[in-house]
Amino acid sequence: MRLSSQRSVADSFSSMPLETLGAGTDLNLQDGSRVALIGGGPAGAFFTYFLLKMAEEIDLELEVDIFEPRFFSRCGPSGCNHCGGIVSESLVQILATEGINLPSEVVQRGIESYVVHMDVGSVAIQSPAKESRIAALYRGNGPREGGDLQWDSFDAYLQGMAVEKGARVRHNLVTGVDWIDGKPRLTEADGTASTYDLVTVSAGVNSNFIKLLKDSPSGIEPPKTTRTYICEFKVGRDGIQEIMGNAMHVFLLSIPRLEFAAPIPKG
């Protein structure tokens, strides 16, 4: 979980010495330019989708590689992207205006309200539209012992949209970055090295790539974090409906070292 913002990636790279980029380096993408995304979660998938969509509109051909070692179609920890899995109403509306409607196989339950529990009492906050437009979902393909659940991964769905636009997913870990003739070069765990015209960092705070950037000319500092515990409990559809209903419960209690707790009903 990110706690405090640091110097942005854009600020960091804009302050890089010109000799690192190379004299006369053209920063405009051209036909055949190569773009790499470090991280294939929602940030990387959305960036890729809209980049290729805009490139298509101006008849610009790009080669885009998404580096993501995880397979979001897998159950359990190997497919989990370390998130409780909740999409806000505002994001659902923004996606809809772009023609992106999350299918029922991805949205497991529509959330109608938030219930906030504090030491002084509890209060329910209803959705302004009074509709179930807050989405509960799985970032991966669900719990390891989840059984035969017919749900699709949110991250895999978005990644699939990017692939349909022409991106290529490389399930490899990037272990090194340097500059060759003013362009970033990425080295993978198997030793493969590739040079790109643009590298976009869409990795999470747990990514080792963020630490690699600290020693690069960009000098990006990893953000401060706090520990987050994510787990799943099999309650059953009837049990969830009886105990929680279609509400996400948030606990803001005076317990040492606890920022908050938030059970999310799914299924």
Which role fits each region the language model picked out?
Residues 43, 72, 206:
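Conserved Rossmann-like nucleotide-cofactor binding loop
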Residues 50-53, 152, 157-267:
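Predominantly flavin-linked oxidoreductase catalytic cores and closely associated redox partners
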Residues 52-81:
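Glycine-rich FAD pyrophosphate-binding loop
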Residues 84, 99, 123-145, 218-219, ...:
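Charged, glycine/proline-rich intrinsically disordered loops and linkers
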